[in-house]
Amino acid sequence: MHTLEQLKRGELNGITRLDLAEGLETFPREIFDLADSLEVLNLSGNRLSSLPDDLPRLHRLRILFCSDNAFTTVPAVIGRCARLEMVGFKANRIRTLPGDALPPLLRWLILTDNQLDALPVEIGRCHRLQKLMLAGNRLRELPESLADCQRLELLRIAANQLGALPAWLLRMPRLSWLAFAGNPFSDRMESEILAQHPLPPIDRTQVSFENVLGQGASGIIHRADWQRPGRAGQAMAAKLFKGNLTSDGLPHSEMAASIAAGPHTNLIPVAGPLAEQAGALPGLLMALIDPSFRTLAGPPSLSSCTRDCYPADCRLSAAQVLRIATNVAAVVAHLHARGILHGDLYAHNLLVDPCGQTLLSDFGAASFFDSHSAQAPALQRLEARAYGCLLEELLAHCATVDDDPALRRLAELKRQCLCEAADERPDFTQITRALETICAERTDTAD
């Protein structure tokens, strides 16, 4: 984090990223002294409500963060910033997004946790848009012009006032990661599906919390000891939910999906929800995962936008690739059969052991749907594209693709999943069958 005093003294000349959070109420004019170098401007955590009309003087600016401020409208001047690709106004009081506030090169727009009740039709002009974060607003519908954003891959519309998912949305050629829980049309399904797969609450007096194992946007995971009457203590993990809206959606929907998902070899077992208690955070008690499991990749970066970032030394064998692919397809098919869309099918949500055995985690973007509805096949095929992206990444980190017939077949399955004609993609029942054939043929060849 930088200081305004450093900026005024000229100590920051030549920097490419500026982070200022000092309760600012006006835009410091000294920022323009950085015009020839500044590419990332982070003014989050201030009290700003406007930006200067000459903001385009920052002619190299690519990324602008103004979250946790006092804006009630997205400043129109942003639309005149020729190089701006990423714009973030999370957690303001924004009620209006003017059509002329959309930069021509926009790839990533974050308006989570505001008061928007409509999007401008001009959103359809954002032909480079890949990532649109709108959870926690008041949207009642999506403009049909959004269908013109043919590169859109990730959409977060949870916790709004939407009455339905428009059919055109599910036909978008690259849409792969969708979260829509917490809307009137999905709340009913959430309640119905959860009622079909209940887990009794666990007495909190039986659980003692120990050290923190990790934390994310929705909560904190503790190591825990579960002491049931008449049984030996059992080492577990407990996730305590903060209760706040995240960029993906609402924590109560994550809890509901984690419970409704039920048991599966490739899911982290959930013992049950912690019993409600005054003043206590809601929580889930889960199995403690063997430390041999590691996250497969890191989340997308500012530059990669929608694609995960793998360690530079990541190398996968053919056997690992096939096992990961098979495990993931099996668990997603299981979720879809229960009316759950994972919504965040990414390598950074996969825990993998050295043999390739895989656990799918993080239901923060999960949504509920009627698995017998007319829209169900389209939702399943939407997530098939996310699976195709995962296959593409797995194959890219395997050196033996060209020499292994099974991996060549897997590459063909990847192409089918990435088909831009959404109706022509396989669903996960078809994907799992294809993988069974691929693995069986590989075993026969090895024998």
Predicted regions and their residues:
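Activation segment signature within eukaryotic-like protein kinase domains
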Residues: I324-A325
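C-lobe/activation-segment region of protein kinase-like
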Residues: G364-Q416
